[in-house]
Amino acid sequence: MPGGGFSRIPPSLKAQDGQPDGDGDDGRFTLGSFSIDEYRPIKVIVIGAGFSGILAGIRFPQKIPNVDLTIYEKSAGIGGTWYNNRYPGVACDVPAHCYQFSFEGKRDWSAFYSPGHEIQAHLQEVVDKYKLMRYIRLSHEVVHARYDEPTGKWHVRVRRTRPSSSSPPDSGEGEGEPHQGEEEAEEEEFEDVADVLLTAFGAITRWKMPAIPGLADFKGELHHTAGYTPRSGRTWEGDLERWRDMRVGVIGSGSTAIQVVSALAPHVARLANYVRGQTWLAPPFSMDMVQDLLGRSKKAAEDDDDLTLHPEEIERFKSDPGYFDRVRHTLEDSMNRDSTMQSDFQKMFRKGMEEKLATRPHIAEKLIPGFPVSCRRLTPGPGYLEALCLPHVDFVSSPIKRFTATGIETEDGQTKELDLVFCATGYDTSWQLPFAIVGRGGVDLNTKWRPHPRTYLSVCVDGFPNMFMSLGPNSIIGAGVLLPILETAVGYAVQAAAKMQRERLRSIEVKRSAVRDFDRYMEHVDGDDDVGCGQSYFPQSVYSANCRSWYKLGKEEGRIIGLWPGSNLHAVKALQHPRWEDYEYERADPEENSLYWLGDGQTWNEKTENGDRAWYLREEFVDRPPGMLKRYAWLLAPI
């Protein structure tokens, strides 16, 4: 629909002077010259084209009329972490059938834990299906964002990279350094301006090499898992042939290291896994459901440790949508149970790990944690414990002392000669962003978020109007399905943009008191004598137990900045319907009339005598009640 703009209303539409209303004002009252649904243009900038950015590309044009949308992605392709991470064994660590949008139903996943390139390819299919490349700008990195208070606009500085003509952007040759004789990519910067800014990049984006002495002296092949790019082909399997006779080191014991060890151990000459901490490994989530869901025998279910789907099973998913929907619903229902908190599960996990490490009891002693299940991220890790038991695989628990030119020396005096080292040593999860976001009063978000981030429901920050976040601080879950939270968080930002457009608002900003109260809900706040630790969420949870976790900035103790304070279903309910009274507003128009957005008393179809004036009878708008209302139907309905 045409936009109403920001212009003042012609004097002819203003009320006559000298006719004060009942409140005793001076009688000046302004009506808008636009229809109530003649929505003004609104510009939205999204940073990142992973799951959140792709969803924003679908929902903003779907829900917001007259929207101008741009999605800036610094990488050369879409998919976020699934485009950038190509390390050996990269895969989804939850059933892939649950790792897709609620309105998309990919039925031909090759495995329950699908490889990363398959997830990225699916996201590309979604982008193509909804024609989102018209909004997405690849190789465009946001380097600065500043809120302008007088106009209520975000000024976003963008660095555009143009690849050199001598090498394609995704050649897979090397680690981002120019090759000999290759021209460096050309860069230029420009500024874009928007009414609404949505950050959609999450915390797990900036990887870091470990601070180990001698790292630069190592003469072999060295990669951080997040920085690795295949040299041969588009996936890591293309490099297996040249790695086959190599001695490989893998540093780490988190979910990434577990996948790398599992993938490489069967294919290399020797492998050493350097492990500093302990970790729980659960049986693959779906193993106990395979028999019922796929109709396999018990023996077949136990034999398929990687949970690869058989061709006939994939074909049934494709040909029988009802069957696929039932399987997906069963998986997600089971994942959303908070069962990992129960002590009997801890006993079951311990028993399972001890059985698989029966021939390596010294590994079980070092690897099995003393802290509760879910204190750290729980991973199924299919094949990892089996890999540790192979004769050519070494489990090294002695701390690393230094790199040498040819390998790694540990504190116990042992040195292993290595040809290839993968550092699965994590990311900078401090939420100190790589670029400045400047809000009201010139406050930098990085400064505001020291020593740790504070938000409102993980989606916005006081002092930063018209800015929303998907996968912001305290948005991830320790157990359950993540995608419903992501969808609801993006939907929250869309609802806020719709409110701004409909009510002609210049700014919408969460109150500082609301941020403070969410902070109190999660943790005891320093200086708050009236809030005891036992009255906040995290001090009573398993996540506060002593274990090193990225939830707590990689520390054993400290504030939890990664997790939502509740279940994933709790997060969905909290974000589903915004509590607008927790916000403050500024109007876009100078008139004092707070109901200026009502316009001239007409709708656009009436005003133009065009279009459908009985649209409310169309099927998509009719809210049909069920034939027989059940007494407790409200418990099930998404109200």
Predicted regions and their residues:
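Extreme N-terminal leader/targeting segments of oxidoreductases
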Residues: 1-44, 62-66, 87, 152, ...
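C-terminal, flexible cofactor-proximal segment of oxidoreductases
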Residues: 3, 7-15, 280-283, 316, ...
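Beta1-alpha1 glycine-rich phosphate/pyrophosphate-binding loop at the start
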Residues: 3-18, 39-42, 46, 51-136, ...
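Rossmann-like dinucleotide-binding core of oxidoreductases
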Residues: 34-41, 45-46, 51, 55-68, ...
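Short FAD-binding loop at a beta-strand-to-alpha-helix junction that anchors the flavin cofactor
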Residues: 101, 221, 390, 458-478
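Feature captures the FAD/FMN-dependent oxidoreductase FAD-binding
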Residues: 110-204
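A conserved short coil-to-beta-strand element within the FAD-binding core of flavoproteins
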Residues: 138-155, 393-411
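Core beta-strand elements of the Rossmann-like FAD/NAD(P) dinucleotide-binding domain
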Residues: 182-196, 243-244, 411-420
